[in-house]
Every structure is written in C-alpha cells, then in structure tokens.
C-alpha cells in the first residue's frame, strides 16, 4: 500500500473575558504599574489560566458588589484533523479523514463565596458504526425494535456494574453539599446513598456507543468524551482503472467508481452540575438527590443528548462519460 500524503493539523484556541476588572489598561502591552504590572505580561501574551482569576482576586483587581453579576468566562476549543491519501494499486485512491473537536466554556462567579463554576460546551468526533448500519430500525409490529437497540438495552447492566466496581472501595467526599452530611468520609454504600442508575447518562452513553459501534461493553470507555485514542477515520474510495479494459475503453471516454462513508459521534450542548462534588479519583463524583438529599453517583456533566450520524454518499457510485 502506497501512502501518498499525510496531513495532521491541531489547533488550540483559548480565551478569557474578565468582567469587573478594576485597574485601568495601560499603554504598553496593556499594562498599568500598580506595584506590579497589571494585568501582567502573561495576560498580554495569552499565557494565562484559571489561576489568574484567583490572583486578580487576591490583589483586589476585581469589582465585587451586588450589582456585579456577570461571571468571568474562559473559552477553549481543541480541533484535531488527520488526513491521509493512499493508493494501494494504480487507479485506486483512498482518502481517510479523522476529526475531533472539543469546545468548552467555563463561567466563574468570582463575586460569590467559593467562586462556583459552571462549564458547558459541545463535542464531536469521527467514528465507525458499520456494524449497525444495515441492521434496520424495526417496524410497528415489533415496536420499532432493532438488534442494535436490543444490545443497547442489554449493555446498560454491564456498564452499570463496571461503574459500581469503580466506586467500590472509595469514600464519600466531605466538601460541597456533603460537608456535614452523615455519609461524609464513610465508605461508599449503594444501599444507603444510592447506586448507579441504569437510566443515568453515565450508563446510557457508553452502552449506546458500545451497541451502535460494535464495541465490547466490558471494554468500551466510560467517558462521554472519548479520547484521541478512540478516533476512527471516515473515507472516500475512487477507482478509475476500469477504463484500461479494452471493451470499456471502446465505448467510454472515462469511468470512475466511487464510495464514501461518513460517521460522527456528537454530544450536544451540555453543562456541568453546580452541586457536583468530586470524589477524588478518575472523575468519580456525586450530585445531590433532590428527594432524599443523599449523594448519587454521577459524572460532572448534565448531557441532554448524544447522537451518531452516519451516511453513505454514495454507497456505490458510477460516473461515466460515453464516447459520442
């Protein structure tokens, strides 16, 4: 197989909007000397992170009163694109394309005690779901059931058990809404504090991915935001070698066969739970059960919906020009 070309592009865009910044902006790189440079050369050259807001607060640079309600905002967009052009034999060309886009926005309410944060964003990446592409979607007689959907339902118990095993041996946190709670600092007990629900998003999303992409539910990642290692390419295949056959060349000026497959996994607009408390390892954590007030295992994010969009354009195409 001959690799003709490989192109890798990665972009990272970070931004910060800090409302309520008190010092005046200076003339040189936007700096004003107030005992130290404000807001600092790091801010001027875009080399600031979340800690800058804490430093600005400690130095009294932020306006904090009942009229200030606009949070500081930190935006981040990561975009990875990988393209490759292959030509295994003369006339057969394969174009591979893989893409992963992760966009996040964090609102930091620095004017409130504890500086609560809320994160939102979106996520999309290319993947392959051929295993369920031709399985059908059922009909009214069988309740529109399908093999992929039946697998999705069955995979929930496997994913839930994996999550339960992950929480097993941990202790409940003592911060956030868990401060002063009777379970704070005690070993995790699903019978007391609530276990992993089969219908929670942290169960449904991995079960959905395993069912529709053909992955083993015992091995599929548990995150709703798969890492770069899970990135799979889409492709376009063309072949124009048939025109070299004499009988075809006799009647056609050109002939090209084509096939294209596109598939992407997307997480729609999501936000973080304001009351989520980190359990201290591997992204484990809890949210407060509205009815009981007890901790319920949960990911940090409130995800409304995920989707897999798949298509062939075309599944098989012929583009020919006659000799006339």
Which functions belong to the PLM regions below?
Residues 1-324:
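Exposed, low-structure sequence patches enriched in small/polar residues
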């Amino acid at each position: 197989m001959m690799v003709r070309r490989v192109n890798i592009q990665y972009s990272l865009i970070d931004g910060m909007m800090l409302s309520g910044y008190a010092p005046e902006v200076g003339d040189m790189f936007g700096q004003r000397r107030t005992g130290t440079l404000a807001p600092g050369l790091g801010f001027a050259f875009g080399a600031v992170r979340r800690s800058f807001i804490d430093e600005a607060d400690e130095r009294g640079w932020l306006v904090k009163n009942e009229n200030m309600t606009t949070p500081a905002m930190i935006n981040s967009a990561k975009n990875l694109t990988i393209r490759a052009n292959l030509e295994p034999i003369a006339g057969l060309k394969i174009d591979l394309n893989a893409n992963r886009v992760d966009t996040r926005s964090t609102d930091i309410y620095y004017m409130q005690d504890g500086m609560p944060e809320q994160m939102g964003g979106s996520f999309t990446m290319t993947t392959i779901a051929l295993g369920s592409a031709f399985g059908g979607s059922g009909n009214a007689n069988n309740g529109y059931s399908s093999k992929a959907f039946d697998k999705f339902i069955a995979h929930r118990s496997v994913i839930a058990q994996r999550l339960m095993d992950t929480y097993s041996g941990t202790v409940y946190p003592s911060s956030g809404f868990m401060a002063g709670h009777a379970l704070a600092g005690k070993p995790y007990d699903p019978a007391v504090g609530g276990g992993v629900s089969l219908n929670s998003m942290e169960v449904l999303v991995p079960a959905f991915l395993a069912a529709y992409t053909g992955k083993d539910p015992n091995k599929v990642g548990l995150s709703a935001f798969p890492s770069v290692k899970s990135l799979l390419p889409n492709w376009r295949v063309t072949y124009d070698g048939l025109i070299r056959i004499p009988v075809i060349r006799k009647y056609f000026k050109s002939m090209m066969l084509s096939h294209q497959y596109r598939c992407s996994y997307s997480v729609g607009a999501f936000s973080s739970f304001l009351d989520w408390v980190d359990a201290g390892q591997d992204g484990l954590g809890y949210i407060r059960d509205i009815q009981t007030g007890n901790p319920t295992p949960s990911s940090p994010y409130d995800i409304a919906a995920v989707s897999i969009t798949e298509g062939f354009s075309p599944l098989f195409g012929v583009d020919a020009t006659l000799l006339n």
